[in-house]
Amino acid sequence: MGMMKKSSYNSDLLGQLTLFEDTDKYYLVMGDPKTFNPDKSYYETKLMKDYSNYLDNSYCQGIADKCFEDDKVLIIGAGLGDLTMRLKERGIQSLAIEIDPIIHFLFTDLTHQTCLMMDGTKIFDFYFINEYNHLVIDAFNPTEKRVVHHFIEEGFIKEAVKHFNRITYNTLNMTEKGLKALEDKVRKYAKLRCTITTEHQYKQKVITFVVD
């Protein structure tokens, strides 16, 4: 792996974590860091395959339209590179965290795509989130209900409004009742210091909270 900056963390949920940092790569290893030896070619191949599929659709366009050039965007549940590729084309800096119960380490290439098994609130354990001002939650896949609930719980929202002044949700699979509950939670913890915009386009329903 060459000489990389190495930092160690302890998580109540995940145990020992080691973050390796290179110029354009991050690797977050669970457990003994000596066992870490990722097959980079596998991930690079998979990322490029997903990128070619993504170019044929506008799935991420609705969310990308909510991001501005001066934003630094932290994305949760973004799939393998879809939204990061779209933002990269626009010159917008982003870091994407994929919540995955199978992959037990974090991997990024030049798109800063990441994979990590974690519960939602644990993201606030990592210092690098302070580099980002816009949080995007794109984890609302109906087959991933075990993941979704973390990001609409009060504990997560209470922390999120402390760290980010823009929070965007893909709420395509949320009911109107669920959407209203989400709005109420954000207003509660932002102490009404937020404006809300919603839009229906690109086969998505997107909601953005802007916290003053």
Kindly give the residue locations of the regions a language model identified.
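Short, flexible, mixed-charge acidic loops at enzyme active sites
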Residues: 38-43, 132
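The AdoMet/dcAdoMet-binding core of the Class I SAM-like
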Residues: 9, 53-189, 193-207
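N-terminal auxiliary segments of SAM/dcSAM-dependent transferases
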Residues: 1-37
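Detector for methionine-enriched segments
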Residues: 1-4, 30, 48, 85, ...
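Segments forming oxygen-rich coordination pockets for charged ligands
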Residues: 31, 43-54
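C-terminal lobe and adjacent flexible extensions of AdoMet/dcAdoMet transferase-like proteins
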Residues: 209-212
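A short, flexible beta-alpha/helix-coil linker loop
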Residues: 35, 45, 140-144
